C-alpha cells in the first residue's frame, strides 16, 4: 500500500510542468513579469468595460462644459452692444414668463394649502385652549360655561370626578348620588279592553 502511494506521488511530481530556466536578471524581475503577464492575460480575456457611473460622470461633465460655454457666450453677446442686451433681456423675460407660468400656479396652489393648514392649526389650537379651560374649571369646582353649538360638535362635557377631594366640599364625595335615573313612563302601552265587554276591569299589558 505504501509502495502504491509512493508511485502515485512520484508520477504526479514528474507530470508537473517544469518552469524554463532563466537567467539571473530574469529571476530578479520575476514578480514584475508575473504581474505584467497577468495584466496582459486579463486584458485579452476580459476587456475593460466602462461602468455606468463613469458614463454618468462623463455626461455630467459635458453638460457642465456646455452650460459654461453658453454662459460665456451670453456674457460676450451682452457686452457687445446695448441693443442686443435689450433684445436678449426681452427674450429672456419672455422665456422666463413662459417657464414661470406653471411654477406660479404651483406656488399659488401651495399658498392656498398653507392657508388651509393654518386655519386647521388655529382651529386645533382653539380646541385645545377650550379643553384646558374646561379642565381647569372642573378641577377648581367652578360651574361650567355654556358651549356654542359650533363647539358642541367637537367637545363633550367631562364627567364629575369624585376622586378629587379638593374639588368638592368636605364629605360630599363620600356619599353616593341622591338622584337615581328612573325609566320613562311614556313607553307604557295603551290599555286594551274587549269591545263587547260590559263592566270589566281594564288591566294594562306590561
UniProtKB/Swiss-Prot annotation:
Top-level taxon in the UniProt lineage: Eukaryota
UniProt KW keywords: Milk protein, Phosphoprotein, Secreted, Signal
GO cellular component term, pick one: extracellular space
Positions where Phosphoserine occurs in the chain: 33, 77-82, 89
Pfam families: Casein
Annotated InterPro entries: Alpha-s1_casein, Casein
Extent of the signal sequence: 1-15
Tissue: Mammary gland specific. Secreted in milk.
Region: Disordered, residue numbers: 67-106
Basic and acidic residues biased stretches: 91-100
Protein's cellular compartments: Secreted
A GO biological process held by the record: response to 11-deoxycorticosterone
UniProt family annotation: Belongs to the alpha-casein family.
The protein's role, per its UniProt record: Important role in the capacity of milk to transport calcium phosphate.
Name listed for the protein in its UniProt record: Alpha-S1-casein
Organism: Sus scrofa
